[in-house]
Amino acid sequence: MNIRILFLGEIVGRPGLQAIKENLKNLKKRCNINYVIANGEGATGGFGIGKNHAIQLLKMGVDLITTGEKTFFKKEMVDYISTNSKIIRPANYPVGTPGRGIKISEINGIKVAFITLLGNSNFPRTHLANPYIGATNIIEKLKNECQAICVQFHATTTAEKQTMAYHLDGKVAAVIGTHSKVLTADERIMPLKTATITDNGRCGSD
């Protein structure tokens, strides 16, 4: 059985939320989408995501909200992310960080794992484990539990994101780069059948 997963670029502020409100329902219907992921870390004015905007996105049809280095820019997210499994933060944050970095969902009978990882370059206020080693370790644990694995890699440099794509080629279904808010025109299927794009852009404007 085939499934269709829609991964929306970073939702930025009010324009991004409005774009989702006006278009997501029809897009899901037109493209027969089974599951919707959105990078929501810029939903609240471009700087983090607050509880109310997270709730709003989920009500508008988003199934899973991912984040990046701005996960905890809004203090209320420290508590809220621990109680809502539909929001994930980078899996390579330090042990003990509130929330989770992995979400396993059953979509039309197929178990799919979604992982978010954060790159090491140019995020000075974060203390991160190596995302490449982290990805390998997580995938090793999940490979017998899930039929597909999708990775969001939130990183500043093209080199980091393309390295992750090659590192995981053949091990996961997709590696989706985020952070720059600029859609790249390099979507492709890697030699070992992993789908990837360096950056999937944004919804709205910053």
Stretch-by-stretch model annotation:
Residues 1-206:
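Acidic, metal/ion-coordinating pockets
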